[in-house]
Amino acid sequence: MAATILYPGRNWLTIDGEVVVINTLDEEIDGKSNPNDPSGVDNASKTGLTWAKYLGTGPTYYADMWNANANTIMFRYAETLLSFAEAKNELDGPCDSVYVALNKIRFRAGMPSVDKGKYSTKETLRELIRRERTVELAGEGFRRADILRWKDNNGKVLAETVLNGELKRYVGTVNYDETVPEKRAVISEDTELVEKRVFVSHNRYLPIPQEYIDLNSKLVQNPGY
């Protein structure tokens, strides 16, 4: 998670070369308004969590937002391996080529190989592949398409479950006396509602912009819009 998410209490090296502690929990810090407090500003993460993935640290990255030296990833070999593993498992069930594909990704991240005994059926391996895909490709634009094509054991599209419900954020404070970043956030049992999300079946498709319908009378708007 630390390679993917910026969380409260984590150390971060700014473009000025200063090490700061991420704090999206406290409304005030040392008597001053916290610019990263989700409840007090519009340009901060509403959940208190944000992406660390692909962000370079220190003064050599993003010093000029129009001339950054961070390389944009256009194609991910890991996504190819995950797609192969998913398709192969659905076609033939567990086999060596599926495990090999998954292990290439896991070994790169310093993770152990897949436990073949634990993931020995098409169903259990499917769940593992979905989890690996969720973790590996987090924040890269694949998630919506994945949960629109994946179904649960009852044949229900996962998006109808995952995208319906309340989105909440943690409540608490950051303990600056704690030296271990993972232990700095003191989380309350309470949570705050960010928004209530609603997903219905027609949301599977996006609306056609009205300007294009105006240009072509034969275009028919997608249902529900």
Where are these predicted regions, by residue range?
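Acidic/polar-rich alpha-helix caps and helix-coil junctions
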Residues: 2-225
